[in-house]
């Protein structure tokens, strides 16, 4: 590379920063010649696999089992739950031919898999002893996206996890919804450092076929909102459509209660890249970094052999401790090496001090150097990995908290909407009777009602009025401009 630094101002031009980092850090190639479909290169795919590993482990520790269902869904299945299919009809990719033969019935590439799972659940579930049933699959889904596509944020094929859970009672189903939120907190916030707010979505913006939808929104550097996970209480809507029933202890057949959960693995990676990155490139949580440490020897001609041998000793010590390590023995200049590995988000170790038996470590998050004795290199690197995550999480929380505003009138909302972020306002209702007010905000200001926060939910005072229609305010809602 001819440039010595990545050097794109993320704060001033996030769109350019994002488009360049995914290409120059070799995360994504979007030149594949089908709109909305991208090539995941090794650096991004390695991170995606790490996120999948963490998320799948969290699900399985809570009783979920992995499965894999077919990519295609028969048209008859898709049309069994009317509200559900209406929500996805315009986004479905249809298979109409097998070779030169037209199929008798069309097959859908899964836009989501409720209608693939639930016919099988109707066969598998017979009695109370079959419940609860908690299954998940890690897969790609396909949606004929008509909005502008953006790699890792909005595409026609994207990666996620979907969990489909079945219970005997409504109470158990709602407990699962709460557990889904806990998993998101553990993985996305605690282990990846991305803060978010879980909202109850307005009825007009819920998952089609659900009774209620709860979704996690984070804030991107440009102040736009990105949904990164959602969980849905389905009630008995799908169990009645697909006749999923069990025999209770009294010998009565009853419809089950269901939930579904969709962590957006693609979008979680987009959030990690965007929120933690800086003007010099990627800054990654230690746990998902493809390379956790790079050893960069900077020898003179006279010390080349001894410095490189010392570097290999450092590499061996770190690898034997289970860390992902590389050494850069290339002929690039020191500046070119530092530029490349900094852009890729990798902390550096420079074994310059052979005689003193210590190494210099460069922290990618703070861009500061610290020294460590060779015998303590493993302990020091692991400790720094924890500190990097804590620092990234703290920085991200500070940013999000600084981007939450309050308004009591449309004039204030209009002014604040230029800043991005969340705007808290008194609002009439998140039921269908509030839909027209929500549509007006979208039409006039490009703002969406994201919903009511599930933590610290506060009811407006008696005299509070909806900023749009002037009726009595039933809720404080968060507004935002979304991807």
Language-model-detected regions and their locations in the chain:
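NTP/phosphate- and nucleic-acid-binding module
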Residues: 1-483
């Amino acid at each position: 590379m001819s440039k010595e630094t990545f050097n794109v101002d993320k704060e001033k031009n996030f769109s350019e920063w994002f488009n360049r980092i995914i290409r120059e850090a070799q995360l994504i190639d979007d030149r594949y010649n089908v709109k909305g479909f991208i090539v995941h290169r090794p650096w991004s795919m390695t991170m995606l696999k790490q996120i999948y590993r963490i998320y799948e482990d969290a699900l399985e520790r809570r009783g979920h089992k992995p499965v894999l269902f077919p990519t295609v869904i028969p048209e008859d299945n898709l049309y069994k739950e009317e509200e559900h299919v209406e929500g996805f009809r315009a986004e479905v990719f249809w298979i109409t031919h097998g070779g030169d033969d037209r199929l008798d019935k069309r097959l859908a590439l899964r836009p989501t898999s409720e209608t693939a799972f639930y016919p099988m659940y109707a066969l598998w579930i017979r009695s109370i002893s079959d419940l609860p049933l908690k299954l998940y699959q890690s897969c790609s889904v396909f949606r004929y996206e008509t909005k502008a596509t953006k790699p890792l944020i909005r595409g026609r094929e994207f990666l996620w996890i979907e969990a489909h859970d079945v219970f005997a009672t409504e109470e158990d189903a709602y407990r699962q919804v709460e557990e889904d939120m806990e998993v998101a907190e553990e993985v996305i916030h605690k282990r990846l450092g991305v803060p978010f707010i879980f909202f109850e979505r307005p009825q007009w913006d819920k998952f089609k076929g659900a009774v209620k939808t709860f979704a996690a929104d984070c804030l991107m550097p440009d102040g736009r909102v990105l949904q990164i996970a959602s969980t849905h209480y389905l009630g008995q809507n799908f169990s009645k459509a697909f006749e999923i029933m069990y025999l209770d202890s009294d010998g009565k057949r009853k419809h089950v209660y269901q939930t579904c959960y969709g962590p957006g693995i693609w979008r979680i990676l987009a959030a990690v890249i965007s929120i933690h990155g800086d003007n010099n490139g990627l800054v990654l949580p230690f746990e998902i970094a493809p390379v956790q440490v790079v050893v960069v020897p900077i020898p003179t001609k006279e010390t080349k052999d001894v410095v490189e041998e010392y570097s290999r000793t450092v590499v061996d010590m770190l690898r034997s401790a289970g860390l992902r390590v590389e050494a850069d023995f290339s002929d690039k200049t020191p500046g070119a090496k530092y530029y490349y590995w900094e852009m890729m988000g990798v902390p550096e170790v420079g074994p310059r001090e052979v005689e003193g038996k210590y190494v210099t470590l460069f922290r990618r998050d703070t861009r500061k150097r610290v020294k460590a004795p060779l015998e303590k290199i493993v302990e020091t690197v692991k400790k720094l990995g924890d500190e990097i995550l804590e620092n990234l999480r703290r920085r991200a929380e500070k940013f999000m908290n600084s981007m939450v505003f309050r308004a009591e009138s449309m004039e204030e909302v209009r002014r604040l909407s230029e800043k991005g972020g969340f705007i808290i306002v008194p609002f009439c209702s998140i039921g269908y009777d509030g839909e027209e007010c929500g549509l007006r905000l979208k039409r006039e200001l490009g703002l969406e009602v994201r919903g009511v926060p599930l933590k610290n939910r506060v009811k407006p005072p008696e005299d509070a009025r909806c900023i749009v229609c002037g009726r009595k305010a039933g809720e404080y809602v968060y507004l935002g401009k979304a991807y």
